[in-house]
Regions:
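Residue-level detection of the helix-turn-helix DNA-binding "recognition helix"
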Residues: 74
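Short, charged recognition helix plus adjacent turn
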Residues: 5, 9, 71, 97-106
């Protein structure tokens, strides 16, 4: 379902002001990937990059072209595990955060 423009603008505005919100966007994207929801994970990372205007910086750090990074996270994009891990690392570096993974029993 496409987001309404006002909701998207609200999310992007909050991401620009709130470092914890940006970190949570990356965390939620990671969780989506780990849960097998690749499309949601890509969408969240794309929203993060758009909200922070970090696409060029992160693309440079990955030694990739901006367009290549955008395609990777686009609806038909299919990032390799290596590309995904490098992208997560670059996003963490951008926000000066580090994730830890813990097993949770269900």
């Amino acid at each position: 379902m496409p987001l309404s423009r006002s909701f998207r603008e609200t999310v992007l505005a909050r991401a620009q002001k709130d470092p914890e919100f940006r970190a949570e966007m990356i965390s939620e994207a990671t969780s989506a990937f780990l849960d097998g929801d690749i499309d949601t994970g890509k969408s969240l990372l794309r929203d993060y990059l758009n909200a922070t205007n970090a696409t060029s910086r992160i693309a440079r750090s990955l030694k990739k072209d901006d367009k290549s990074l955008r395609r990777m996270l686009g609806p038909k994009g299919n990032p390799t595990l290596k590309n995904f891990i490098e992208l997560l690392h670059a996003c963490q570096h951008e926000e000066q955060i580090r994730f830890e993974v813990r097993a949770v029993h269900q």
